[in-house]
Amino acid sequence: MPDTSARSPICTVDVVLLTLQQGALHVALLRRERAPFAGALALPGGYIHVGEDADAHASAARVLREKAGLQSPYLEQLATFSGAVRDPRGWSLAVAYCALVPPELLTTAPLTLTPVAELPALPFDHRAMVDAAVARVRSKSQYS
């Protein structure tokens, strides 16, 4: 049996950008350009570039800049999502970040603001990331 313990997982970052608009919590989504799930709405995310990104936070900031045209707001590390079945390409881990930002920051095309209460099916485990970010924001609002 081959030794598979040294195989590297797919390493990515995903960013949950939340905002209040018309009294409802919204999340910023992008349409995926590549497989898997090409054409689906998803959280802004991408690979960690080992030779370019100093750390996962820098990777998240780069992804927001490149894919959404955003200068990184204050980003808080949310959680790490990992496993053999979260990505059809193979074993992967994603470091998720979140931020609560003013809606005017998210007026950049190609972002789509979607009410959290009306989210479509999302690829990977992006729904779990949104749920975790919403829980974090609600928890913080109770002691702020």
Regions from the PLM with identified roles:
Residues 2-27, 49:
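Conserved N-terminal beta-strand and adjoining loop/helix that marks the start
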Residues 10, 72, 90-94:
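Short connector loops at helix/strand junctions that flank enzyme active sites
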Residues 15, 77, 97-99:
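A structural signal for short, well-ordered beta-strand segments
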Residues 17-19, 31-32, 101:
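Residue-level signal for short segments within beta-strands and strand-turn junctions
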Residues 24-72, 82, 144:
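Conserved Nudix-box catalytic region and its N-terminal flanking loop in Nudix hydrolases
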Residues 37-41, 101-144:
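Nudix hydrolase/Nudix homology domain
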Residues 71-78, 107:
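Short secondary-structure capping/junction motifs at helix and strand boundaries
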Residues 84-107, 133:
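Active-site-adjacent beta-strand/loop module that shapes the phosphate/pyrophosphate-binding cleft
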